[in-house]
């Protein structure tokens, strides 16, 4: 089981703070979040951490991993 935590606009827009899912690759996580209504565009620009370390959309996951997804910060 993987714990997925959302932060920033991803959390605000989706209303999802945390989900527990079965996944072996980041693609599985992203597919699950799109099924929950988060757009591919919003997910494409997000920062991905696995167990607190920078990761990519091609990363492999292991039971007990914590995936954190954050929307990029913008200002102006």
Residue ranges and their predicted role:
Residues 1-75:
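Ubiquitin-like/PB1-type beta-grasp interaction modules and other compact soluble beta-rich domains
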């Amino acid at each position: 089981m993987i714990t997925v935590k959302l932060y920033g606009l991803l959390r605000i827009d989706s209303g999802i703070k945390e989900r527990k899912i079965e996944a072996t690759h980041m693609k599985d996580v992203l597919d699950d979040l799109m099924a929950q209504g988060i757009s591919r565009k919003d997910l494409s620009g997000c920062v991905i951490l696995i167990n607190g370390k920078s990761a990519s959309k091609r990363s492999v996951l292991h039971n007990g991993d914590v995936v954190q997804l954050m929307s990029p910060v913008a200002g102006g």
